[in-house]
Amino acid sequence: MIEHGSVVEHRRVIELRRVARVFEVGTEQVHALRDVDLRIGQGEYLSLMGPSGSGKSTLLHVLGLLDRPTGGQYLLHGKDVTALDEAEQARTRRLHIGFVFQAYHLVPRLTTAQNVALPLVLAEVPPAERRERTMAQLRAFGLLDRTNHLPDQLSGGQRQRVAIARATVTRPELLLADEPTGNLDRANGLEVVRILEQLHDDGITLIVVTHDQELGRRAHRQLRMDDGRLVGDVGEGLGPNPGPNSGGLRGQSEDGT
């Protein structure tokens, strides 16, 4: 089992016990995850790296309750969430987990404000509180002057800021980011990283999937996957963030995907 000292010192948020994920492709079985054991403490900042097809995104989807493991257990705050039905898993996602994706996944017909407010609508937050929290997010992410813009009227960096604002409007404790700088140039990529790291400094548990070694090394704890297995776990847990200009963060992942 891959362990880490910080989990002893900080309240455990996540525990995976021999988690496996097998996909049926025709007559073939593809083992995307193989007996993954992992513990993550509250407030950690992790990167998840490895070659294409190593299982990084599958693991992130399992952690985010977007996919169910074929075997093993996923404990979130000690509760086996693999045993929950679809409605219970959806409620757990809304309460505890935020997502940021490479492709933004904004709703094209909704304005910036409407995209940010969408999780609050789904959570049935009252309209007055919904507006207040949405405007607070727009202000915090420098998007007030883009409140009524549609996604195709925004730059890539602005779209990703909208996506992060939407992901955190419900105040989740866990933020999962899958190649968050992959579609951005260097300047916008660094700005997105700065925002994510500020959210971590504010107390959120942050897990970033990336091909970019320079981005991965910014994390305090660095996990490496290969062929569906965790094969490396290095770092010092909750140490200080590197400076905003450390490293030459590329705006695109190292293999261009």
Feature annotation, model-predicted:
Residues M1-V22, G232-T257:
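ABC-family P-loop ATPase nucleotide-binding domain
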Residues R11-M225:
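ABC family nucleotide-binding domain
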Residues Q222-G235:
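H-loop (His-switch) and adjacent beta-strand-loop-beta switch element
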